[in-house]
Amino acid sequence: MYIVMFSKLITILAGISVVDSTNIYNYYELAVQKWCSNDYMIHGLWPQINSTAYPENCKNVSYIKPTGELLTDMNAYWHACDSTLWEHEWTKHGSCMQEQNNIDENTFFNTTISLFLESTNLLDKCESDDCIVACFDLDYKLIDCE
């Protein structure tokens, strides 16, 4: 009985990816959507371990609503019909970028907007109202999405 259980455990563990403890993710996916808009808007910038796994809620972070020019840019490119979207994206995905790269909330939002603006020529590849429009390495250089 113990051999069967051990065998099942080995099978399960074989399917789990081991991530370098210094890197909780390997690249980023830029997701867009047409939720509440006729045009594609930012959904989020998501740290990824591989094409099917991503870290989330890596660190307990507080959310401070953007102000000034950042708020203007976010309303233009990251339109949030649901007022909790920005907070959700920061706490779920941005917290992992803060954990690994020590970036703050404003840097997370500004980086996401910059990558979106650099990727608008790729929007025509989207075949649905939500898609991954581009992938970036850890230095924010465009890479092929896997």
Language-model segments: residues:
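Betabetaalpha-Me/HNH-type nuclease active-site subdomain
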Residues: S17-A80
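Short linear motifs in intrinsically disordered/low-complexity regions
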Residues: M1-I3, S21, Y27, D130, ...
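Cleavable N-terminal signal peptides of Sec/SRP-targeted secreted and luminal proteins
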Residues: I3-S21
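Intrinsic disorder/low-structure terminal segments
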Residues: M1, M5-K8, T107-F108, C135
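C-terminal, well-folded lobe of enzymatic/effector domains
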Residues: G68-E146
